[in-house]
Design a protein with these regions (language model features):
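Flexible C-terminal active-site loop/helix
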Residues: 1-11, 15-41, 313-398
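Conserved, mostly hydrophobic/aromatic
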Residues: 3, 65, 86, 124, ...
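Metal- or metallocofactor-binding catalytic centers and their adjacent structured scaffolds
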Residues: 45-46, 61-135
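Short Gly/Pro-enriched turn/cap motifs at secondary-structure boundaries
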Residues: 46-50, 346
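Short beta-strand elements
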Residues: 56-62, 354
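Hydrophobic faces of well-ordered beta-strands that scaffold small-molecule active sites
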Residues: 68-70, 150-157, 172-174, 205-211, ...
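Shared catalytic-loop signature of beta/alpha-barrel
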Residues: 80, 225, 231, 242-261, ...
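Metal-dependent enolase-superfamily TIM-barrel catalytic cores that perform enediolate-based chemistry
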Residues: 145-249, 254
Length: 398
């Protein structure tokens, strides 16, 4: 079966109306530091990164009309890569040859792999896997080895901890309000933040902190030592992804909690270096950023052979991450990102066919492909003529 067309699209899903019984979730109030936050005219509070653009989708159609869908980040920047660079490379080729197609796209990007190009590759690869599952009549998790567990254990990311506990979660990741240039006052604020979280979730719950690349080695070591009494399950992405030597030093020095990183590492080669250097105890590829499912499977193999666990970034909230975690033995849990209001059903912002968390677990759809059930009239072509400029929100801390 040949690929007939590859197109970038967007999903025009109807928006869910807010209920008077809900209140705004952590994305609207939690102070979170990011690398750009060292400059006070950039926000530290909104859920999106300053300058980020909306997600886009890839629609791959086979000769018989069957289609697959996959999504990717940095949509407005990467959409042209899909339509004008990748599409003509793979149209007319075997739709089931996911390994060949992944390798073709990867080799075609020599010289500009990573970042925007790899995000575009992610969407194409996911759409191809979705199409492959549909053509073969199998869920994707069956195509990558079959289920290794009955359900995927989840940890919830957010600061609405009481609500998250009420929903049945027992594993939690909280935000980081501290950027290293704030000095000892900011560090004290962070310690108080973690102490409150530990008090709410209890001593037996898993608790994790995500600094989002906001530290240097010195501050990361000081933070890890100050937070030692609160028994973090892991310390996530304290440094920028390019600081391999910094991660090596941190992992050598921090022995009381696991070190995790990887969501901003792109493609197998970046992870090969990370794993070979044993620079982390847990790696966290994002399937929509790092090259898709094909790349993530290669990354998993590197890590598994080295005794390093793979827990995908945002994996529990996406169909692709759910299928991956169900199938891979050394992927003990997945991340459920809390993007709904407090009191709002978790499924309200999910697309049809994406499984919803229940009691801290999720069971992926067993429908062919990734199980997406998106109405065709929601799928509209990407409008390249309507490119919007990135939005940089003013700081709410000024």
């Amino acid at each position: 079966m040949k690929i007939k067309s590859v197109r970038c699209v967007q999903i025009d899903a109807p928006e869910t109306e807010s209920s008077p019984d809900t209140r705004p979730g952590w994305n609207t109030y939690a102070t979170r530091s990011q690398p750009i936050a060292r400059y006070t005219d950039f926000t530290r509070v909104d859920g999106g990164k300053p300058g980020s653009t909306k997600k886009a989708w890839v629609h791959v159609t086979a000769e018989d009309g069957t289609f697959g869908l996959g999504s990717f980040a940095h949509g407005q920047l990467a959409a042209s890569v899909v339509d004008y660079f990748i599409a003509p490379l793979i149209e007319g080729r075997d739709a089931l040859a996911t390994e060949l197609l992944n390798d073709l796209v990867w080799r075609s990007q020599e010289g500009f792999q990573g970042g925007i190009a790899t995000a575009a590759q992610s969407g194409v690869d996911l759409a191809l896997w979705d199409l492959k599952g549909k053509l073969l009549g199998k869920p994707v998790y069956e195509l990558i080895g079959g289920p290794s567990r009955q359900a995927v254990e989840l940890y919830a990311t957010g600061d609405d901890l009481e609500w998250m506990k009420e929903l049945g979660f027992t594993r939690f990741k909280i935000s980081n309000p501290f950027f290293y240039e704030e000095g000892s006052e900011g560090l004290t604020k962070l310690v108080e933040h973690v102490a409150r979280a530990r008090e709410i979730v209890g001593d037996e719950a898993e608790l994790t902190l995500n600094p989002v690349m906001s530290f240097n080695v010195d501050i990361a070591l000081r933070v890890a030592e100050r937070l030692r009494p609160y028994k973090l399950r892991w310390f996530e992405e304290p440094l920028p992804p390019w600081d391999l030597q910094g991660y090596i030093e941190l992992n050598r020095c921090i022995t009381w909690t696991a070190l995790a990183t990887g969501e901003h590492h792109y493609g197998r080669k970046a992870f090969q270096q990370l794993v070979a250097a044993r620079a982390a105890d847990i790696i966290q590829p994002d399937i929509e950023w790092t090259g898709g499912l094909s790349e993530t499977l290669k990354i998993y193999t590197y890590a598994e052979a080295a005794g390093i666990e793979t827990i995908t970034h945002m994996g529990g909230s996406t169909a692709w991450g759910q299928h991956f975690a169900l199938a891979m033995p050394e992927s003990s849990q997945a991340e459920w990102f809390m993007n709904t209001d407090v009191g709002q059903p978790l499924g309200d912002k999910l697309l049809p066919g994406v499984a919803t968390a229940k009691g801290g677990k999720v069971v992926p759809s067993d429908a062919p492909g990734f199980g997406l059930e998106i109405p065709e009239d929601w799928i509209v072509p990407w409008d390249h003529s309507n490119q919007a400029r990135a939005v940089y929100l003013p700081s709410q801390n000024q």
